[in-house]
């Protein structure tokens, strides 16, 4: 199911049309999953948009990258303001999902990521109603086992960990 992306995104500190936010094919995160994300809900009450637990989300956002020495080069306040700002820029008047993420950028094919690796940050939003179909869902139990918490910090919201959830 493809959801409509917001017209504007926040990318590396600037608001821009979504189609202008581009990354090179040598972006490290594409090859190795070195991305950090949050999923934030915001609820429209008919008058105002309320972002759910923004401060807690921003703190976890930064902490997830610290597990892997991936730097978030914006302050928590700048990220929180960008989350609110992208909702305003897109004139959001209904409940929505906000996806901030940062990732190791044009770092090439290298397995050794350091805190000096270039990072990019983006935030976008889209309308998000019910997560599941009101008529029910189909579910299954798979035979795959999750990674052990001893093998990788599974509590970090990282792109490389997401398939394990």
Residue ranges of each PLM-predicted region?
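Short loop/turn motifs enriched for small/polar and acidic residues
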Residues: 101-105
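Short secondary-structure capping/junction motifs at helix and strand boundaries
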Residues: 71-76, 88-99, 132-134
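Helix-start/capping segments and mature chain N-termini
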Residues: 1-73, 81-85, 109-165
């Amino acid at each position: 199911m493809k959801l409509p992306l917001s017209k504007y995104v926040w990318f590396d500190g600037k608001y821009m049309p979504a189609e202008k936010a581009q990354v090179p094919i040598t972006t490290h995160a594409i090859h190795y999953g070195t991305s950090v994300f949050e999923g934030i809900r915001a609820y429209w009450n008919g008058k105002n948009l309320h972002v759910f637990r923004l401060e807690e989300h921003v703190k976890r956002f930064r902490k997830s990258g610290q597990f892997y020495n991936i730097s978030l080069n914006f302050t928590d306040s700048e990220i929180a303001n960008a989350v609110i700002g992208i909702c305003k820029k897109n004139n959001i008047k209904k409940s929505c999902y906000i996806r901030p993420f940062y990732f190791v950028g044009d770092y090439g094919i290298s397995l050794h990521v350091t805190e000096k690796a270039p990072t990019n940050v983006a935030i976008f939003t889209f309308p998000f109603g019910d997560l599941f179909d009101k008529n029910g869902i189909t579910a299954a139990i798979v035979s795959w086992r999750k990674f052990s918490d001893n093998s990788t910090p599974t509590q970090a919201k990282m792109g490389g960990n997401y398939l394990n959830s």
